Amino acid sequence: MKTKRISFYIILLAVFACQPSGNQVQGANAQQETSEKTPTAYEASLPTLADSAIARGFTTDYIMGHFDPAKHPDFTLVDTRYADRQGLYLRKDTYEAFLRMYEAAKKDGVSLLIRSATRNFDYQKGIWESKWAGALAIENGKDASKAYPNPQERALKILEYSSMPGTSRHHWGTDMDLNAFTNEYFEKGEGLKIYEWMTTHAAEYGFCQPYSPKGEARPYGYNEEKWHWSYLPVAQPLTALAKEKLKDGMITGFKGAEVAEEIGVVEKYVLGVNSDCLSQ
């Protein structure tokens, strides 16, 4: 009987010895929670970037394009030597960086041409509503109002290449479209030469391609745009401010705006950009 009792206690002690202590369990749980909550470098920098945007006078109205670039003190008219038409505006800092990049490209036999620059809310509204109503065909050549009667489906088709008013990076004065509006142009000949130069040198002047190929690294947002380039020294703080302050419910004032919240347009489109454009 005594032998059985001793054997029982030995087994019991062995069981307790194999169990982690309460401190060990708590420590493991704490470590797991810490690991799960560890922010990315970009997320960690968001408060600083957003604060810098606010300190520079940026607001959600600015992000949403509620201003006239022709009357804004931080904007300048693009000289037609560098654009395909009159009346294009960029932020002064962005334009100065572009001019430096233009001259460097020219020395390498590459000619850069601005096709589109700042588009404020009203300008973007005109583009969006023309596509929404079918007055302007979408990229697949269809009349969206007839081909996609469901409002959310129609918005998603237009969003493949065009922004809802209030959500476009073109509102910011930091973004421009160069040379052509098709990816195919940049895949051969002169277009390929331009694109290879830009992917090699644009970062030296502060520029980044926000709409890289969609896939695992960028599952949401607009389709790839090899022509679209963004000036990061200003666009990065504005992106951070958008993440902090811009909400889907603020996206109003145009036909189809009612589906902005269903789609999650801020998270998926305003913030659905190339990760290289989020941190330097």
Residue ranges of each PLM-predicted region?
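C-terminal motif of bacterial Sec signal peptides marking the signal peptidase cleavage site
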Residues: 14-17
